[in-house]
Amino acid sequence: MNLLPSNPHGNGLLYSGFNQDHGCFACGMENGFRVYNTDPLKEKEKQEFLEGGVSYVEMLFRCNYLALVGGGKKPKYPPNKVMIWDDLKKKTVIEIEFSTEVKAVKLRRDRIVVVLDSMIKVFTFTHNPHQLHVFETCYNPKGLCVLCPNSNNSLLAFPGAHTGHVQIVDLASTEKPPVDIPAHEGILSCIALNLQGTRIATASEKGTLIRIFDTSSGHLIQELRRGSQAANIYCINFNEDASLICVSSDHGTVHIFAAEDPKRNKQSSLASASFLPKYFSSKWSFSKFQVPSGSPCICAFGTEPNSVIAICADGSYYKFQFNPKGECTRDVYAQFLEMTDDKL
């Protein structure tokens, strides 16, 4: 979740994002970066720079390498550079420069993927990175891109050349034609892969529908309705076995859907009437909760099977528990920016 150009909360938070398995989340700050354990919440790393903001932080599971991009009022690094930080040495060990601003970075153990506003470049994850591939995208100011972290699956997904399309390439065999999915009519706002790389979830800027596709065939598996009013989708994430997804939006809500068993999702009692519009047959979330502050947030499933974590732009952390009926209760609340590593 990129909070540039301005975070209204004035807490210095520029960016927050989960690592590949959601076990940690990282924050880019006006004066450095921080890393937290997601559940239970615990500050793991706090790197402060005397002068310099970090607008993007990408972790590689829990290893010592992080990708940093400078940003904020006084960027620590030029915004057109990717810096690979070694947290054991407490310094940058790799630097890659581009002619335009870096929008996002994705890592896997063997690759560095850099997202620019209309192309994606793939490099070897070596001391002297070697460029392997370049993929053109439509205009992509949000830096949308997902990289499967699974060692047996090298899928990379990103907005295609056509509006609303998702393109999926296999980095292990790029000679294979990419899978092109016409996911939405409008501009994409969010994409997410499950951990195994077998499913991709998508949302458009309209934000009313979430669609789930099979990554190998491109076939639509499920269409889920977040709501009837347009919304800005901040985050979509699958749980570990891809049976559930959680979705956060600017309506201050986090919705939970069944991704594999559609019978769990709510449906209108009028759904069986064939003459009614498609809206009434929609699959709605079986559970949802309101983030009390209404602040922009990212969400992911916790370590317990029926728990969801929300990380908010105002520095608040929420853990909610839900039951099979969809009833939701708040379990934990904390201010993660104010804690120190010995508090929890």
Swiss-Prot record:
It holds the Pfam family PROPPIN. InterPro entries: PROPPIN, WD40/YVTN_repeat-like_dom_sf, WD40_repeat_dom_sf, WD40_rpt. Its main location: other. Keywords: Autophagy, Lipid-binding, Lysosome, Repeat, WD repeat. One of its GO terms (biological process) is autophagosome assembly. A motif (L/FRRG motif) lies at residues 224-227. The keyword Glycosyltransferase does not apply. WD repeats lie at residues 183-223, 228-267. It is found in: Preautophagosomal structure; Lysosome. One of its GO terms (molecular function) is phosphatidylinositol-3-phosphate binding. Component of the autophagy machinery that controls the major intracellular degradation process by which cytoplasmic materials are packaged into autophagosomes and delivered to lysosomes for degradation. Binds phosphatidylinositol 3-phosphate (PtdIns3P), and other phosphoinositides including PtdIns(3,5)P2, forming on membranes of the endoplasmic reticulum upon activation of the upstream ULK1 and PI3 kinases and is recruited at phagophore assembly sites where it regulates the elongation of nascent phagophores downstream of WIPI2. The L/FRRG motif is required for recruitment to PtdIns3P. Belongs to the WD repeat PROPPIN family. This is WD repeat domain phosphoinositide-interacting protein 3. It comes from Xenopus laevis (African clawed frog).
